[in-house]
Amino acid sequence: AAHLELCRDKIHLASGSTIGNAKLNIGVCNGFGLDALFRGRCKWGKYRDNEALFLYTQTGEKVVVFAGGGKADSYKRILGNSYGLWIATEINEHYDSDDSRESFIKVAFGRQAAAMDPLVLWDLNPCNPNHRIYGDYIEHYQETNLPGYLYEHFTIDDNLSISDERREEIKAQYDPSSVWYRRDILGERCVAEGRV
């Protein structure tokens, strides 16, 4: 929110695997989303036929375009604009390929070429450690020491919106030796092994 408040770019991108996913996880976020952070200074609407949240900031109006990125042709919805901030939820569910003209991820990066204050923020839930999101992006940027790159690993214990009591109830629902516990509770990258 601080970046949107002060940045010089007008148009920004919020993406999820679907538009609904992006709106729920970034726009609303159970009362912690952009529409809560800018309460009284924002309104939902359309921007060139795209779902959007219009923000009224210290530096003028900002438009956050919401897009789904999970399908092979999702990139088409984000063409034609330059974006300052790109915030993506569950980035590992976005469509990616080696073709930079069709990969939602690569097209979104390319749409930031003219940004004055570019910023990329991603979240993801752990998945197969061999998923290309790790090798092609996360680990690649860690290894190249890209200026401004920051990777943070969080577990359920880092989620301040969940009470200690509720957190323990959630943990009790899992077998601590299961892949699901490792993924959902510990935030580890792992894959199920053996017979299903």
Predicted regions: what they are:
Residues A1-V196:
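Phosphate/NTP-binding elements of NTP-utilizing enzymes
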